[in-house]
Amino acid sequence: MKRWADDGHIGIAKTAGGHRRIPIADAIRFIRERHLAIERPEILGLGELQAAPEAQRAASPADQLRAFLVDGKAAEARGLILSWYLAGQSIATIGDEHLRPAFETIGSLWLDSSDGIFVEHRATEIGLAALHQLSALLPVPTSGPVALGGACSGDTSLLPTTLVAMVLTEHGFRAQNLGANTPIASLTHAITRERPALVWFSANHLDDARAFDRDLIALSSTLERFDAMAILGGRALAGLSNPMGPRLRVARSLTELAAWVDGWNQRRTTP
């Protein structure tokens, strides 16, 4: 370990007493890059990994996660999500390939089951707790561009905007998640105050599509004033009549968002 630290392969910080310690985020990065197994995850505060079972051949990762969420097995769900990240999967992959299909199935349970809403709400809380735990393991950029956003007014979904913030953090942004049900006026105030380079707006449910069209026009004007871009996503965008302007882009998935951000960052930093 000392050799790896001395060679610069793993970050070291000094305590107030002058002792050297490895920040958790640096340890996690090193584990992911080297594909190392963690023998005692509880030392890193990742005891949930012990609850994550070996992959079942007959079940997809999304099906495994769905089963844990439906049964309210919080530790197992958190451990499974952590295991994917530690194995080297990106946040976009975890969101698109595992969480999205699991929650799409759970979200339709209420159609055939009287306890469907209860199961969905509990599963959402478990999922959010897992993402917050995982978010704490991401290396936090100290000098990257600012990004901020949330779910639109009337949209109470928390998982999508949380995942977007995590994807952007993973790609070097200092992301500020404003959460669910964010009025356009509040988003405008945030843009004016924080001067972000990138804004995101999630729309999985719209109370008023025409009002949202007007919101996008107002948002475009604010983006122009502060030389920012916005990325939009969510199921509700399919019915929009307002064409996307030069400051607005649509991402149909987290993977598409990550690819677009990589290209955009490269264009911004290329002389």
Where are these regions (language model features)?
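Residues in the recognition helix of alpha-helical DNA-binding motifs
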Residues: 4
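Long amphipathic alpha-helical segments
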Residues: 9-139
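C-terminal regulatory/effector modules of DNA-binding transcriptional regulators
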Residues: 113-116, 122, 126-271
